[in-house]
A protein has these predicted regions:
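Low-complexity intrinsically disordered segments
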Residues: 5, 27-28
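Short, extreme N-terminal segment that most often corresponds to the first beta-strand
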Residues: 1-20
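Residue-level detector of alpha-helical secondary structure
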Residues: 15, 19-23, 59-62, 66
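Acidic, low-complexity, intrinsically disordered interaction modules
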Residues: 28-90
Length: 95
């Protein structure tokens, strides 16, 4: 996979980390859907998901990216609907 990071509002250190993660791990391509109430429309953004357990190998990355790790709220491990936390990297970071 050839990855070139675009210039975005993300700081350069975070972009370098994203680039390394996408090279080293097998990100899952996905689409994130969100509803814009003021436009009454649903939008879809391409994104990549990386399981957080992969980040456990590199603890400083997990700490650096903590704000980007998505947790499904309202459910606990073992309950219906529980999902392991994952790192979300929006496709617009990548060219």
């Amino acid at each position: 996979m050839k990855i070139k990071i675009k210039s975005t509002s993300c700081n350069s250190e975070a972009l370098n980390i994203y680039k390394e993660l996408l090279k080293k791990y097998n990100p899952v391509e996905t689409t994130i859907e969100y509803y814009a109430e003021n436009y009454n429309e649903t939008y879809q953004n391409p994104a990549y998901l990386i399981d957080v357990p992969s980040l456990a190998i590199i603890p400083e990355l997990a700490e650096e990216l903590e704000e980007d790790i998505i947790y499904r709220r309202g459910s606990k491990r073992g309950e219906e609907g529980y999902q392991e936390p994952f790192l979300l990297i929006y496709d617009d970071y990548i060219e």
